[in-house]
Amino acid sequence: MEEDQLKLTLKRLSHELIENHYPFTNTCIIGIQPRGIAISDFITQYIQTIHPEVTISYGKLDITFYRDDFRGQIHIPSITDLPFSIEGKQVILIDDVLYTGRTIRAAMDALLDNGRAQKVELCILVDRKFSRELPIQPDYVGKSIDSIVTQKVKVVWGDEKRVILYDSI
């Protein structure tokens, strides 16, 4: 997926969130660190560009200490930045790629340590739908792909923005 298609997909996801959550008075958007931040930044900024009257509660969630592979790898924690209460709110978690579901499970654990949300929805840029190890399904999907275990999906968010599917062997 090249940059034009990627931006179009992110704008579509933004419009889906607007359709279901406008005016965002009881909704907060939370990006999962590290790779969900660029996507949640884009979506939040785009919504506020087309609806400047809207104030979105926006935060960033670090899941380092909630991962089930924490002891097996070296992870440098980031800072969780939730400058609002999620108590009774509708929360939209945003990440780049949904693969096994383990990152989302860790995000749910981290989120619940910050309060009890009324509802939690999941917004994903790329859904690798046949690789799930946990019963987790997204509510908003940018692109759904069929991939095998030896393939990887990488979201590049620098000067060139794109999604790459490649073989890892």
Name the predicted role of every residue range.
Residues 1-26:
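Active-site-facing substrate-recognition patch
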Residues 30-33, 61-66, 125-127:
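Short loop/turn motifs enriched for small/polar and acidic residues
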